[in-house]
Amino acid sequence: MDTTGKVAVVTGAASGMGLAIAQTFADSGMKVVLADIEEEALAGAVSQLSDQGHSVLGVRTDVSKLSDVEALADATIKEFDAVHVLCNNAGVGVGAPVGSTSLADWKWTLDIDLWGPIYGVETFLPLIEEQGEGHINSTASMAGLYAGASLGAYNVAKHGVVALMASLERDLRWRDSNVRASVLCPGP
């Protein structure tokens, strides 16, 4: 897919890997929507990219809330009239073993790390398919492939993300779609 002028949405884009992904997309000629829950960091990231002459939009988004993800999609279409790429990158981690993780920490981790990508896929897939081609990527972790010690909720969420993206890719291929799906599993 030629990326020039295409539109990418990156969650968790205010810092770290998300900002690096947004920077890479922008450098390749894409218009980029940066989404993050941290408003101050998001404003800084948007300034950083726009000061380089890139076409960017920042949208404060809590990916654990479907209404926020839907508002992100609406803002993207309103600003750029299209979306071609979604990168579900927002994530959190709680370092606690199964049996010692509070139910609140389980819910928080699963809401952001698993439900966030689910909301992203379900909200953005129809919009991306309207373009005739595109890509949806979700960031998991090596913990999505191999359970690490004392990372119960994180392991479960990231295994779910790997399964979500494998299921999505299979469904897209079965439908002979020009949209692709992939999962990124960074780790040591």
Predicted segments with their positions:
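Substrate-binding pocket helix/loop in short-chain dehydrogenase/reductase
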Residues: 97-98, 105-107
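The beta1-alpha1 cofactor-binding region of Rossmann-like NAD(H)/NADP(H)-dependent oxidoreductases
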Residues: 39-40, 60-71, 103
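Canonical Rossmann dinucleotide-binding motif of NAD(H)/NADP(H)-dependent dehydrogenases/reductases
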Residues: 2-33
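A glycine-rich helix->loop->beta "capping" turn
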Residues: 52-55, 75-86, 94
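Residue(s) in the substrate-gating loop at a strand-loop-helix junction
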Residues: 141
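Conserved glycine-rich Rossmann-like NAD(P)H-binding loop of the short-chain dehydrogenase/reductase
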Residues: 28-44
